[in-house]
Amino acid sequence: MARVLVLGVTGMLGSAVFKTFNSDSEHEVWGTLRSSAGLRSFPEASRERLLSGVDVLDQDSLVATLAKVRPDVVINCVGLIKQLADAKDPLTALPINAMLPHRLARLCALSDARLIHISTDCVFSGRKGGYLESDLSDAEDLYGKSKYIGELHDLPNAITLRTSIIGHELNSSHSLVDWFLSQEGSVRGFSKAIFSGLPTAELARVMKDFVLPHPELNGLYHVAAEPIAKLDLLTLIASQYGKSIEIRPDAALVIDRSLNSERFTQATGYKAPTWPRLIELMHATR
C-alpha cells in the first residue's frame, strides 16, 4: 500500500486528487490545508488524515509534515489561479510557482519519496499549438514564466505533468466551469481558443492508474486530451449539465496552447477518453 500525501486539498485539483485516492483501498492518502475551516468540505471519516495549518512556504512546516506522514509519494497541488491578482505579484507567484517545487523535490529526495508536480500549458504563448516537451517555453507573463521555472525536468525522484485542468472548486466560482454554470442569458464561446486539458477527476485517475504504477518515470511529460475549441467545450458542458444558455460564437480570441501527449501515451499506455465522455465523468464526480 502506497502512502500518498496531497498538498493543497482545498484547491480545485487537490480536492479531486484526495477524493480519488481516498476511494481506493490500495492507497493511504493524507492531505494538507492551510486553514481548519476547509475541513468541513470533507467527510468526517477522512478528516483524521487531513493536516490543517500547514504553510507550504514555511520550511519547518513542510519538514514536520513529511516527518509525520512519511509518504511514499507527494503530489503537489498547491498553486495560484492565473485569473486572480496574486498571479501577477512576484512576491506571491515566485515562492509558490517557481521555488516551492524545487524545495519539495529536495525534501522528498532526503526522505526517499517520489514527487509528482503539476505544471501548465500556460508556459506557452499559444501561438502555434501542438506543443511538445522539447518546445521552448515562450510565455510572456509572470504566471507562465514562474510555472516554467518551477518545473522539474531532470530529477530521478520527480515527475512534472504539464497539462491544463477544468473542474469544480470547493468554495468559489473562479474556474471556467463554475463560472459558466453561474451565468444567465448568454455568454461568448471562443471558436479559436483551443484547449487540450483534462477534468480534475480524470487527471487524478491518470496519476493513480498510470503514474504511480510507473515509478521509473521522471522528468517532464505532457498529459492532454484531443484539442477542442472553448466554444465546443462549453456546448458540451451545457448539454451534459442541462444548462439553458445561449453561447454566442466569437472568433476574436485566437490562442492554441494544446499539448501533444504522445510521449506520455507511449510510456504509460494512457489515451484520454473522448470529450463527451470526459464531460460526463466531470459531471458524475462533481
Question: Which functions belong to the PLM regions below?
Answer:
Residues A2-D24:
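N-terminal Rossmann NAD(P)H-binding glycine-rich loop of SDR-like oxidoreductase domains
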Residues G31-S41, D55-V56, G79:
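N-terminal Rossmann-fold cofactor-binding loop
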Residues G53-I96:
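NAD(P)H-binding glycine-rich loop region in Rossmannoid oxidoreductase-like domains
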Residues L57, K88, T92-R103, S134-S137, ...:
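Glycine-rich NAD(P)-binding loop of the Rossmann-fold in SDR/ketoreductase-type enzymes
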Residues E140, L152-F195, A201-E202, D209:
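NAD(P)-dependent short-chain dehydrogenase/reductase
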Residues V206-D209, P213-S261:
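Mid/C-terminal beta-alpha module of Rossmann-like enzyme folds, strongest
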